Amino acid sequence: MRHEHATHSFFTQALSVAEKKAKRRVQSRVMTKRGSAGLGEVDAEYLQERKRACRIASGAAQLGEMFRLLDSFGLQRSKVQKQLHLGMTGAVLQRIFHMESDAEMKVAMTIHRIKSDKQQFMAITPRRFGKTTAVAMFVAALALAVPGITVAIFSTGRRASNLLLQQVKSLLLCVPGAAAKIISSNVETLHMADGSMTSKISSYPGMARTLRGTGGDLILLEEAAFISPDI
């Protein structure tokens, strides 16, 4: 409960910072315009900036929300799963903070104890160690917390890829309000809408000949040792 309260406070604080940044940008643009801008024009421009800021602004807010969601699926994460999630988070930090400075990203890394922002992460675990569930939890939380994200998951075969996407969807349905965001879903792809932004989660069998033109902000290879190197 204490962690959830702290995350919520951090989320609120981050949105407040985003709002202040948006206001400064608007004031700067108004000052450089020829003549004077009417109050209505300023208010309308500020409103648009605030909406944009709250949507993309705070990578810190999105990150805090993602970690909150990881503990909201009704599953108790193991120590290893938490470590996997920290590693996977490091791989997507550049995407989450793509509109912000490296300094802001480093602050968030310190807060959440993320050790690396390298965009490649590999984990080697025994079977039956909860890695597939950990992947499904991470993808579901990321899609909800970061609107507009595109995730591509590659598994060893069609059955495995279908089951993984089903698991992601089941976790999404555990979160109040998430079901309403799912606009389409089939055995291979799930789309979610958040305002004007659409997130896409795809789960494919690892066969290179059928996967031309696929990719995403996050690419996950489950059991990578058994997936064709052509992927």
Q: Which residue stretches match the model-derived regions?
A:
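Phosphate/NTP-binding elements of NTP-utilizing enzymes
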Residues: 2-231
